UniProtKB/Swiss-Prot annotation:
It catalyses: Fe-coproporphyrin III + 2 H(+) = coproporphyrin III + Fe(2+). It comes from Staphylococcus epidermidis (strain ATCC 35984 / DSM 28319 / BCRC 17069 / CCUG 31568 / BM 3577 / RP62A). Its EC number is 4.99.1.9. It comes from the Bacteria. Keywords: Cytoplasm, Heme biosynthesis, Iron, Lyase, Metal-binding, Porphyrin biosynthesis. Gene3D superfamilies: 3.40.50.1400. Involved in coproporphyrin-dependent heme b biosynthesis. Catalyzes the insertion of ferrous iron into coproporphyrin III to form Fe-coproporphyrin III. Its main location: cytoplasm. It is found in: Cytoplasm. HAMAP family: Ferrochelatase (MF_00323). The keyword Transcription regulation does not apply. Fe(2+) binds at residues 181, 263. One of its GO terms (cellular component) is cytoplasm. This is Coproporphyrin III ferrochelatase. The gene is cpfC.
Length: 307
């Protein structure tokens, strides 16, 4: 008899329409409403990238692709999909409640973020676990999947494809900037958090597996909290790398993200490109994983190793 297991896919969430922006931003700021200036700045960023971020639709497609791929691999288990978001409905708690209403007793959770941090993935897991405990639902949490061969293969192929656009004799004048979302430095240090090490390990593996010669690690999209965040910031890093090594070509791989959204389309494709244009170097940013079979397969492989 086929056993039904919940598949709780969790993500940050994004506004679906303009009227969602203020409550969404307020939720991110833990109930503190943004000023008109802050709200307008966010609206301007969305407008700059062509309207509201495509993240919502992409997240849905990623979750559906993951469900389909998992169920193809399993004969004795049928996964049922639930989507839980951090900052907008359907919230994580709503998804777990729906599982309970559907009679789900066991579920696997996975966050659409390849590296583990107690601040990010850990907080999603905690919210899901606290709600699941109310209903006696058993959860298996997937912590990370950056180390999965298919995840590495995806980025290796994209890096090598990008290098093909650059003359061979200029490969030594090319640098790969591997980045993820910055997080508060104090919190990372207090928790002895593995997050920076996992990004470093990703960069090292990509250097080993791809044809790139030079690799640098950076952080991006830090919050405005008045406290130190992980650095160097990718924009500062770009200027420093140019100053020290005179690289001509900069390839940005924001491997901590899994699709094209505001942090990639604005923070990389606009802000980093502005820096590249200013110092007179070439900007490249390979396509994000989105629903690519290698990316989906990496998560499937990680889940299968835990069930």
């Amino acid at each position: 008899m086929t056993k039904t297991i919940g598949l709780l896919v969790m993500a940050y969430g994004t506004p679906y329409k303009e009227s969602d922006i203020e409550p969404y931003y307020t939720d991110i700021r833990r109930g503190k409403k943004p000023t008109e200036e802050e709200l307008q700045d966010l609206k301007d960023r969305y407008e700059f990238i062509g309207g509201l971020s495509p993240l919502a639709g992409t997240t849905d497609r990623q979750a559906e692709a993951l469900l389909e791929a998992l169920n193809k691999e399993q004969d004795d288990v049928n996964f049922k999909l639930y989507l839980g978001l951090k900052h907008i409905s359907p919230y994580i708690e709503e998804a777990v409640e729906q599982m309970h209403n559907d009679g789900i007793k066991e579920a696997v959770t996975v966050v659409l973020a390849p590296h583990y941090s107690s601040f990010s993935v850990g907080s999603y897991d905690q919210r899901a676990q606290e709600k699941a405990d109310e209903y006696g639902i058993q959860l298996t949490h997937i912590k990370h999947y950056y180390q999965q061969p298919k995840f590495i293969k995806y980025w290796t192929e994209k890096i090598n494809e990008t290098l093909e656009q650059i003359p061979n004799q200029e490969h030594d004048e090319t640098v790969l900037v591997v980045s993820a979302h910055s997080l508060p430095k104090g919190l990372i240090e207090r928790n002895n958090d593995p997050y920076p090490h996992e990004l470093h390990e990703t960069a090292e593996i990509l250097k080993q597996e791809s044809n790139i010669i030079h690799v640098a690690e950076g952080w991006q999209s830090e919050g405005n909290t008045g406290t130190p965040w992980l650095g160097p910031d990718v924009q500062d890093l770009t200027r420093d790398l140019y100053k020290e090594h005179q690289f001509k070509h900069f390839i940005y791989t924001p491997v901590g993200f899994v699709c094209e959204h505001l942090e990639v389309l604005y923070d990389n494709d606009y802000e980093c490109k502005v820096v590249c244009d200013d110092i007179g170097v070439n900007y490249y940013r390979p396509e994000m994983p989105n629903t690519h079979p290698l990316f989906i397969g990496a998560i499937v492989d990680e889940i299968q190793s835990h069930i």
